[in-house]
Amino acid sequence: MGKLTTHILDLTCGKPAANVKIGLKRLGESIMKEVYTNNDGRVDVPLLAGEELMSGEYVMEFHAGDYFASKNMNAADQPFLTIVTVRFQLADPDAHYHIPLLLSPFGYQVYRGS
């Protein structure tokens, strides 16, 4: 059974990013799900699993600006990024897809994890 998971790390403090809003949709469709990360920077259940996970292109929207704004940063350090959009393709509905996001107020890195 395939699944889609994610994990967000805050590079400014080297800790998981809790309470980050994530939107997920299939390309060309409206938002399928909106979830928030837990204290470990993960979502409590897979974003997609089983029959929900179908081949195709998807978009995840990580609401980075809201997250960093909640950290009471100095005005000069207000985040440059508001929403990090990641567009990706799921080819095998039986595979486990994990998309980690390494995040700072001014940049990010995303990759297919394991």
Curated annotation (Swiss-Prot):
Changing residue 42 to K: No effect on activity. It comes from the Bacteria. One of its GO terms (molecular function) is identical protein binding. Keywords: Hydrolase, Purine metabolism. Induction: Expression is very low in excess nitrogen (glutamate plus ammonia) and is induced by TnrA during limiting-nitrogen conditions (glutamate). Expression is further induced when allantoin or uric acid are added during limiting-nitrogen conditions. It catalyses: 5-hydroxyisourate + H2O = 5-hydroxy-2-oxo-4-ureido-2,5-dihydro-1H-imidazole-5-carboxylate + H(+). Changing residue 42 to E: Loss of activity. InterPro entries: Hydroxyisourate_hydrolase (IPR014306), Thyroxine_BS (IPR023418), Transthyretin/HIU_hydrolase (IPR000895), Transthyretin/HIU_hydrolase_d (IPR023416), Transthyretin/HIU_hydrolase_sf (IPR036817), Transthyretin_CS (IPR023419). It is an enzyme of class 3 (hydrolase). Substrate binds at residues 7, 42, 111. Changing residue 111 to F: Reduced activity. The keyword Hydrolase applies. HIU hydrolysis also occurs spontaneously, but more slowly. Belongs to the transthyretin family. 5-hydroxyisourate hydrolase subfamily. Catalyzes the hydrolysis of 5-hydroxyisourate (HIU) to 2-oxo-4-hydroxy-4-carboxy-5-ureidoimidazoline (OHCU). Homotetramer. This is 5-hydroxyisourate hydrolase. It comes from Bacillus subtilis (strain 168). The lineage of its organism: Bacteria, Bacillati, Bacillota, Bacilli, Bacillales.
